[in-house]
Amino acid sequence: MRTLWIMAVLLVGVEGSVIQLGKMILQETGKNPVKYYGAYGCNCGPLGRRKPLDATDRCCYMHKCCYKKLTDSNPIKDRYSYSWENKAIVCKEKNPRLKEMCECDKAVAICFRENMRTYNKKERINTKIFCKKTPEPC
C-alpha cells in the first residue's frame, strides 16, 4: 500500500503532498489515483502544462496552475492538515501557505469527481506525443 502512495507522485507531476493528494482523490472518486489519473491526458503526470484534451485533463492543468501560484513551498515534503467530514474534504491547516496547497489538492480531487462521466479510458496512459505544447494561460 505504501508503494501505491509513493507512486502517486506521477499524478500531477511532482506536485502536491503525495499521500494526502492520493487519499483525497480516492475519497472523492473511489478510484485508484495512480491507475486512473497518473498518466491521463496531456497534463496529468510529470510533464509541463499542455493544451488540455478534455475536462479530466483540464483538472490536472488547473492543478498545475494552482501550484504555480504557491510560493515558498515544497509540495513533496510539506504536509497539511485536512479531514474527510460528511463526504467532504475540509482543509483545516492554520498555516496559510499549507492551506493554499490543501485547497489546490482539494480542487483537483473534486474536479476529477465532477468529471467522471466524461473520463476517457483511451487517455488513461497517454504518451503525450501528440499533446500541443502551447497551453492556455492560467
Curated annotation (Swiss-Prot):
GO terms for cellular component: extracellular region. It is found in: Secreted. GO terms for biological process: arachidonate secretion; lipid catabolic process; phospholipid metabolic process. The record marks 128, 133 as: Cationic membrane-docking site (MDoS). Residues 1-16 form the signal peptide. It comes from the Eukaryota. One of its GO terms (molecular function) is calcium ion binding. Expressed by the venom gland. Disulfide bonds join 42-131, 44-60, 59-111, 65-138, 66-104, 91-102. The record marks 130 as: Hydrophobic membrane-disruption site (MDiS). Pfam families: Phospholip_A2_1. Monomer. PANTHER family: BASIC PHOSPHOLIPASE A2 PA-11-LIKE, PHOSPHOLIPASE A2 FAMILY MEMBER. This is Basic phospholipase A2 homolog Tpu-K49a.
